[in-house]
């Protein structure tokens, strides 16, 4: 078996990636989220595939087909709620995975990091299009508002929006193409994940100290396969508790009302995992400025390697930057809360303050904190 594992052209790729892979001996549970994201992707593809067997991407029947899945298809309710809440679990793992990367300075592996940012955009695009498919009120109005943002692009904006819509409003053509893209994107994401792993295995994993771990490596299997399996069990337990006991807690009640272009919901808002970006978008009174801030709120992650001023890689031994980091986390939670609130006093000013703080902490305060720590430790 050892010979096959190491010699067979296909099996040896798996061997070098998941069995004989040299891994740092001290990586903590924060390194579990990569495998958990892989699990989330598999769950989403499988549940999505079974949903697609019963779903119809037509404006007249889309809402009814989702109701039919929940009422008449064997375990259709379970598949539908696993898919909807699977997206939430996916984003929880994504945010923790990115947060880990920022905390431990994993962004210094530039190719892996940039590939991760591309993956983040791809997953966000997929989730947005998936939210449109049930064709409820929030699906329709969310699609209208977000696609309309592209009209802020000078000169080509309006043409671009109508091209994406396939008409003069969000309608049948829009729903059909969103379904097509929502179906294909997860497979593209799977391919991108392999590239992400390819880049990671070029450098090897980072570790909680931020130091080079070449002198102290252990094989991935059995140590981290067992550790990942524990993470999988915990994730699945949390996931099934959410799905079976609180399936609608993260959804919007408006989406149980069929889409009606003549009736606007009082508060149009996206799913919870987009609220922080939505709050940043809304905090700028100018449409184009808002769109740029929205894109930059994610794209700023690509600047992380350039903004790294410290001589140390991780934040493990850097209390000043640690403080900045946790203020940033709190700020993101505030933005998430504000994104779900109506546009009125005092939420407008809180959102604007939190948006400025978000960019200021990343671009100004964390780099300055890094330099201060260098001086304290005399690391010139």
Swiss-Prot record:
Its main location: mitochondrion. Binds 2 heme b groups non-covalently. It is found in: Mitochondrion inner membrane. One of its GO terms (molecular function) is ubiquinol-cytochrome-c reductase activity. GO terms for biological process: mitochondrial electron transport, ubiquinol to cytochrome c. A ubiquinone binds at residue 201. GO terms for cellular component: mitochondrial inner membrane; respiratory chain complex III. The chain crosses the membrane at residues 33-53, 77-98, 113-133, 178-198, 226-246, 288-308, 320-340, 347-367. SUPFAM superfamilies: a domain/subunit of cytochrome bc1 complex (Ubiquinol-cytochrome c reductase) (SSF81648), Transmembrane di-heme cytochromes (SSF81342). Component of the ubiquinol-cytochrome c reductase complex (complex III or cytochrome b-c1 complex) that is part of the mitochondrial respiratory chain. The b-c1 complex mediates electron transfer from ubiquinol to cytochrome c. Contributes to the generation of a proton gradient across the mitochondrial membrane that is then used for ATP synthesis. This is Cytochrome b. It comes from Microtus canicaudus (Gray-tailed vole). The lineage of its organism: Eukaryota, Metazoa, Chordata, Craniata, Vertebrata.
């Amino acid at each position: 078996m050892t010979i096959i594992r190491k010699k067979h052209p296909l099996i040896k790729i798996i061997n070098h990636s998941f069995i004989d892979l040299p891994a740092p001996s001290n990586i903590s549970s924060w390194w579990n989220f990569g495998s958990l994201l892989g699990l989330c992707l598999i769950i989403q593809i499988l549940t999505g595939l079974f949903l697609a067997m019963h779903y119809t991407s037509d404006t007249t029947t889309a809402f009814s087909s989702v109701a039919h899945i929940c009422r008449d298809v064997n375990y259709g309710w379970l598949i539908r709620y696993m898919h909807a809440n699977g997206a939430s679990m996916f984003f929880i793992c994504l945010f923790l995975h990115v947060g880990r990367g920022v905390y431990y300075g994993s962004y210094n592996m530039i190719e892996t990091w940039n590939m991760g940012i591309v993956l983040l955009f791809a997953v966000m695009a997929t989730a947005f299009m998936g939210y449109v498919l049930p064709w409820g009120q929030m699906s329709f109005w969310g699609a209208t508002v977000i696609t309309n943002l592209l009209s802020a692009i000078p000169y080509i904006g309006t043409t671009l929006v109508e091209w994406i819509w396939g008409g003069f409003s969000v309608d049948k053509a829009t729903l059909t193409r969103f379904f097509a893209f929502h179906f294909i994107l997860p497979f593209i994401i799977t391919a991108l994940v392999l590239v992400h792993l390819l880049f990671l295995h070029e450098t090897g994993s980072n570790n909680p100290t931020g130091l080079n771990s070449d002198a102290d490596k252990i094989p991935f299997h059995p140590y981290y396969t067992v550790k990942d399996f524990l993470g999988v069990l915990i994730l699945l337990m949390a996931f099934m508790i959410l799905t079976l006991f609180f399936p609608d807690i993260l959804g919007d009640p408006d989406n149980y009302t069929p889409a009606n272009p003549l009736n606007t919901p009082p508060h149009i808002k996206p799913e919870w995992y987009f609220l922080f970006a939505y709050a940043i978008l809304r905090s700028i009174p100018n449409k184009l400025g808002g769109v740029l801030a929205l894109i930059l709120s994610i794209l700023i992650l690509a600047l992380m390697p350039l903004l790294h001023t410290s001589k140390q890689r991780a934040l493990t031994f850097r209390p000043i930057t640690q403080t900045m980091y946790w203020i940033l986390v709190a700020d993101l939670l505030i933005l998430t809360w504000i994104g779900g609130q109506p546009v009125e006093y005092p939420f407008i000013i809180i959102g604007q303050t939190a948006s400025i703080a978000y960019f200021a902490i990343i671009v100004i305060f964390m780099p300055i904190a890094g330099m201060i720590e260098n001086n304290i430790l005399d690391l010139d």
